[in-house]
């Protein structure tokens, strides 16, 4: 039997759906309304996921997070319902929202999670073994060097990459028949999600993102590559013999992938690349870069794009240049960043650079289909980015909880102050909802669905990571603003999550918004 809060949630859910149908479908003129609704839908979906997976010990947290979500929905939709084509509805049992939000209930939740673990995510036994393996690896190998890599802007050391190769980390999305760990007959996105979370808990830049590029390239090859290409590349990527990067973004084509202009002109035996790219992460160390280029200049949209596997020597330098005997040239220069350090993101330039025709993904069949192959990889990449956000905020939360327990202020432990307890309750809710929703989406995608949810969970988890990292730093006070504590790294790393793999605004309006307003 449903309680009043659940009944109230159903009515708000119906209101949200109605608002999505009512709002205009003009992705330019109506983008403010679309953005608000997309973010609301993302949070509401996460709140439902947490409510569905919370056992008896964590019901208070689930109710608090759901009530907070409904209170926010009420503010967004009903302050002026005419904006979304709604009348002024009467919500049954609306007072049910108030009880979980009372200060005494919030501090009770904060006290619970100040001394107890976050809700269990209920993994199958084989997945729990994998999670524990990578959690131990993160504690032993990644966390001890993560802050040094960040503070000194170092490249990920081989002492991390080599054991990750041995664990099969780079082959999580590659079928066993090609040398990877993914079963040949089914998807296993749960493994990818939990491994990503554990590595990201150690370091987002130096570990959690190492498997994103193999994930995107593997999906593109499996979707559109020829059998010869799959046999040539997938095994080497899975073993870590071939390190890889992905090069899509340009100065005037960030999240607007369809506007890519780097050209690939047909020549005897292959193609000539001319143009530049930005934000090509790990381009220096990589042996191959997946490059999205325009092969048909008569098509100004996504229809004229193709994908190429561009081979190069590995380099550990912040700047590199590779010249071909034919006169072609590739250069790369690392971009200095606030955070997300360890893999280095490069500005790339290609001048008359020759790529053999066998490196066009899909061969002749793949010509001008690169956009579709890229999007296939990005969809899984967005799920993985949600997992990266989960790992980062969990790490920020755990270090902050320990700090608050030890720190005293005004003759009381920091953790005993009600405002601290409220922040702990908020962080626990955001992290737990992000984790359960990420796993729910992974299961949907394993069954062939979940495309919209992959975008929603990316929106929610990445925004949550910013909020958690901000509160974590705030609770550290002045020490949080110093370089030494890891929470300062969490703070600057969290910001990038809502930018890459599709900016928050573009994803909410152009991807989620298009789906919401059509359906």
Where on the chain are the PLM-derived regions?
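Alpha-helical interface subdomain recognition
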Residues: 1-201, 212, 224, 240, ...
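FAD-binding core of flavoproteins
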Residues: 1-8, 17, 118-123, 186, ...
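Glycine-rich, histidine-containing beta strand-loop boundary motifs that form or position
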Residues: 175-176, 209-211, 248, 275-277
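Alpha-helix capping at helix-to-loop junctions
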Residues: 201-205, 222-230, 239, 243
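Core alpha/beta catalytic barrel or barrel-like domain that forms the active/cofactor pocket
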Residues: 206-214, 241-250, 450
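N-terminal glycine-rich flavin-associated loop
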Residues: 207-228, 254
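Short, hydrophobic/aromatic alpha-helical segments in well-folded domains
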Residues: 216, 220, 232-233, 294, ...
């Amino acid at each position: 039997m449903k309680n009043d809060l659940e009944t109230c949630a159903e009515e708000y859910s119906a209101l949200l759906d109605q608002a999505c149908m009512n709002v205009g479908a003009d992705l330019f003129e109506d983008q403010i309304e679309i953005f608000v609704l997309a973010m609301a839908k993302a949070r509401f979906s996460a709140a439902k996921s947490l409510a569905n997976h919370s056992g008896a010990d964590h019901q208070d947290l689930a109710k608090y997070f759901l009530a907070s979500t409904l209170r926010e929905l009420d503010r967004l939709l009903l302050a002026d319902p005419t904006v979304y084509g709604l009348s002024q509805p009467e919500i049954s049992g609306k007072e049910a929202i108030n009880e979980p939000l009372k200060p005494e209930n919030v501090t009770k939740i904060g006290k619970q999670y100040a001394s107890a673990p976050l809700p269990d995510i209920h993994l199958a036994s084989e997945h729990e073994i994998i999670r524990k393996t990578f959690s131990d690896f993160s504690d032993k190998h990644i966390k001890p060097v993560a802050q040094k890599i960040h503070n000194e802007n170092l490249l990920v050391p081989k002492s991390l990459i080599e054991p990750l190769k041995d664990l099969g980390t780079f082959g999580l999305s590659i079928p066993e028949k090609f040398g990877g760990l993914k079963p040949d007959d089914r998807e296993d996105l749960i493994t990818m999600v939990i491994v990503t979370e554990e590595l990201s808990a150690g370091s987002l830049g130096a570990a959690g993102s190492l498997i994103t590029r193999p994930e995107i390239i593997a999906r593109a090859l499996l979707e559109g590559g020829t059998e010869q290409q799959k046999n040539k590349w997938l095994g080497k990527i899975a073993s870590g013999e071939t390190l890889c990067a992905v090069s899509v973004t340009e100065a005037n084509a960030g999240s607007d992938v369809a506007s890519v202009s780097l050209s690939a002109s047909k020549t005897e035996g292959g193609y000539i690349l001319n143009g530049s790219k930005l934000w090509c992460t790990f381009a220096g160390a990589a042996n191959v870069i997946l490059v999205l280029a325009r092969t048909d200049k008569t098509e100004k949209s996504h229809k004229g794009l193709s994908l190429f596997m561009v081979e190069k020597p590995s380099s550990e330098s912040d700047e590199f240049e590779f010249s071909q005997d034919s006169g072609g040239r590739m250069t790369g220069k690392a971009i200095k960043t606030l955070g997300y350090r360890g893999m280095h993101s490069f500005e790339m330039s290609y001048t008359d650079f020759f790529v053999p025709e066998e490196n066009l993904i899909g061969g002749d069949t793949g010509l001008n289909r690169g956009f579709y192959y890229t999007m296939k990889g990005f969809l899984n990449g967005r799920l993985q980015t949600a997992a990266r956000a989960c790992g980062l905020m969990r790490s920020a939360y755990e270090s902050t909880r320990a700090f608050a327990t030890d720190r005293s202020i005004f003759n009381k432990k920091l953790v005993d102050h009600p405002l601290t307890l409220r922040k702990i309750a908020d962080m626990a809710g955001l992290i737990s909802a992000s984790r359960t929703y990420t796993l729910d989406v992974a299961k949907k995608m394993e069954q062939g669905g979940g495309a919209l949810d992959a975008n929603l969970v990316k929106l929610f988890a990445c925004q949550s990571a910013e909020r958690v990292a901000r509160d974590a730093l705030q609770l550290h006070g002045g020490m949080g603003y110093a370089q030494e504590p890891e929470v300062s790294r969490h703070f600057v790393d969290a910001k990038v999550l809502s930018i890459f793999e599709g900016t928050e605004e573009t994803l909410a309006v152009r991807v989620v918004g298009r789906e919401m307003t059509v359906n």
